[in-house]
Structure formats: structure tokens, C-alpha cells
Amino acid sequence: MRKQIGRLAVIALLVSACGSGSATATTPAGTVPGTVGGTVAGSTAPTTGLGSVGLFASALVEFNSCDAFLGHVKAEALERVGPYGLHGAGYAGPDVWDDVVLEVAVAEMAESAADAPTSVTAAPSPEPEAGVDYSTTNVQEIGVDEPDIVKTDGNRILVLSQGILYYVDVSSGLPDLLGWLDLWSWESQIVKDEDFWRYEMFLGSDSALLIAGGNGAVGDLTQVVQVDLSDPENLAATATLTVEGRYVSARLVGERASLVLVSRPHERIPFVYPASRSAEPRAEMANRVTIQETTLEDWAPSYVREDAGGASRGLFLDCASAYAPKEFSGFDFLSVLSLDMAGGIDIEAVSTVMSGGDTIYASSTNLYVATERWVDWFALDEEEAISEAETIRTYIHQFDIAGPDGVEYLASGSVDGYLLNQFAMSEHDGHLRVASTNDPSWGWWLRDGPSVSRVDVLAREGRDLRIVGSVGGLGEGEQIFAVRFIGEVGYVVTFRQTDPLYTIDLSDPENPRVVGELKIL
């Protein structure tokens, strides 16, 4: 396939160096709900005096029907499509000559579905012996479990290694391997013909929830497997759920798991590609026609659910729980899926925002997903690209994970700079504390400039996460290397040549202040 390589090469370097967040979408099993109309949620008024909350954070478009959602996506695509598709959003399609346009069929998700083993009635798991101590996964918040490859409740140890789940009984004080389940074996066919390389799990009272992330024939895939633990010598998968999308992470509160996925189904749209500059107008026209003819299935990720009763498939998107920023933020779909481990793998609740998703943090009631601001680098010249990259912002989406609906989108906000990891976020008394670093020299092509870090305190007002307090000027010329929040105190470590430790009093959310500083040479 011949490809034109021109000025896009420089922009491609910008994209690969800066990177942009991925995103995901979701829909519950069965039919997709829909009523006509779309509404604007939240206000657009920025917070004054404490830095901008960002237009992205306010005025999210809420869709009440699939027609409204599809119309929004197609309108955004028609505004941005060119002879090379959606600015290199993935598959480029076939060459287009001056007198012909080649058509390519859209790749579909593999439809093979092997019968899952019959479910076994689960027996209650043994309670750990009083006074017996055992280690658990290192978690950020008490009561909020995080996925791991080893889990224990004091009586049993589950180990997930290279696609095999091992059940070890330790109730007698000595380890006894009772059984295992091979996810890759031809007999089980739990993981089929895909390249899954990331495995994690949660341990519930009667079952284990295995989560696999990897690549399939149509891009990123996430597979969730529920394993019945009632008969350790005959472990059996009772249900599996395979979804188009990249697995970001998950959290477990009680028996309810919240999974975060980012999907890019738009990459499979069969845009054509010009074989010469004179063919560009024809290619752009063909790509516009392609967008106009797309359906919801072309833009939304799909899922396949399998259990002893057979397989079902559908779109992983609930249009009634889908949102898009008023400021366009890409065609990725950020999805939060709620699963009840006690009730099996049923797509009970899913909420979607058209945005990226990179870092997650959860309290016992709320889940936050952070991603760096999306920029259409291909639409910018060199000076515009430098200006955008010098003003790094991180956007944060808040979801309720404690309500009766399983998961519900609440609000969005933004802070200057980028986050180190999940520990850069912490919720306390209804406020979200966020530590970030703003580095104008981030990237080899940018101008020199001092980096500086800060801690912002955000509170929800309607659909907005607004900054109500800030403390800045932390470690000028340095970046954050470690963060911890403990109650009303925050600890931030920055580093370049020295290793400063800042102690921050957060007892007054509207007036955070540095109360201690230690520099280690």
C-alpha cells in the first residue's frame, strides 16, 4: 500500500511524544434505550481567583437517545474528517487513485462462543480464624480493594500466574494446592485466540473475578471471567464478558466491582487513503460519505457475554448514560462498568463519557478517572502545537459507585499540569485533593522553562468539579516523585538535584497551606 509522507511526519512526532488519552464507551446488555433530545448539563461559569476549572469541565452534553448521540458524533466527525480520515485515528483504509475509490468492509468482532461450564451452587467461604493475621493487597484507601495477582482471606490463597488460577488452602496452617484453572487451555476455551498479557483479579465471598487485558483481531480487548470457588478441586468459569476496549483498572467495594475501560471503535471505520495529492479531494469526499453512512455500531464498542445458557452480544453503550464535553475531546469512549460479584457477570450499569482515561482513584463512594487534555495536534501549526503543549491540563471525571444504580456520572473538572499516579488524588470530607506538576519544557521540542507543582482542592457543584482552594510554588524546577494524603495532611516529594518534602495542611479546603519543608541533599 502506497502512502504519502509529507508534513504529517512532524505532527506524528508531536503526537508520539505528547500522547493523548484513550477513551471508552458503554451500554448495558439487551436493547439500547432512547428518547428524543439532548440537554446541556451543568454551567459554564469558571471559578475565579483560584485558576480556571476549564470549559471542558462544565456544560457536558447529556444524551437522552441514541439518535441524539449518533448525530453528535457524526457532526464532530464531519467537521474534522479529511483525505486521510480522522487525522490518523487508526486504520487508514485502501489507496484512492484519481479515478477510483476502493471500498473496504468493516472488521467485525469474532463471533466464536464456546459453551461455558455449568454453574455450581456456591457454598459459603470459610471465615478466617479469629486472631489469625494475614497480609492483603497494598491499597490506597481502607475498604476499597484493588486488583492483584495474589489474593487471600486468611483461609485460602488465590494466585493468578501466566493465565492460570491456582487455589491454595491454608486453613490448616500449611499450604495445600487443591486445584487450578487454565484460562488458555483448549479444554476450557475461556481465553480464545487473543493476546491477553495483563491478568488481575478480585476475591469475593463465593467467587473470583478475573480481569484480562490485551489485544484481539480488532484492537484492544478486555475479558472478565467469573470463577466459582465452591469446589476448589474443580474450579469452573460460570460466565465471561468480552468487551472492545483497553482495560485501565478496577476497584472493589464490598461485592461491587467498578471496571474502567477505554475504547476506540472509530479506528475500524474504513476510510480511504489518497494515492497522490491530486486524489486528496476525491478521498475526502469519499470519507465524508463514509461518515454520513455510519451507524451507532460503527462508533460504539461491542461486547459478548457467555455462560452456560449460551452467548449474547450487543453494543457496550447506554445512550441514556452517555455524555460528551462541550469542548470536543476526541472520539474515544471512557466507560465505567459496575458488576455485582454476588449476582454474576450481568451488565447492570455502565456510564460513558467521550474522553480519555489514564489514571483512576476511588473512595468508598466515588470513583475518579483522570486524563490529560485532548488536543487535535494534526490541526495545529508548529507554534500552536508548542503553545498547547506548554499549557498541560488534566481533566478529572467523577462517578458515583455507591448508589442503587451501580454507577452514575456526577461531574468533571480540571487542574493545571499532569498527575504522577493514582496517589496524586485523594478524597476527604467531600473534597478531592489533587497534586500536579506543570512543566513547560515537557517534550524535547519545547522551550525551556521552570516546572512547578501544586495541590488543588476541588468540590462538586452540580456537574462541575470546581477548584475551591490551592497551594502552589512547590519545588520550582522540579517534578513530583511521590505523594501521600493522610486525613487533613498532604505530603509531596519533588526532585531534581535535592529531594524536598513538603507537608501541607488541608484542614481548611479553601485555604490549604504549606506548614513544613525538608530538603534532603
Which residues fall in each region the model found?
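Bacterial N-terminal signal peptides that target proteins for export
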Residues: M1-L8
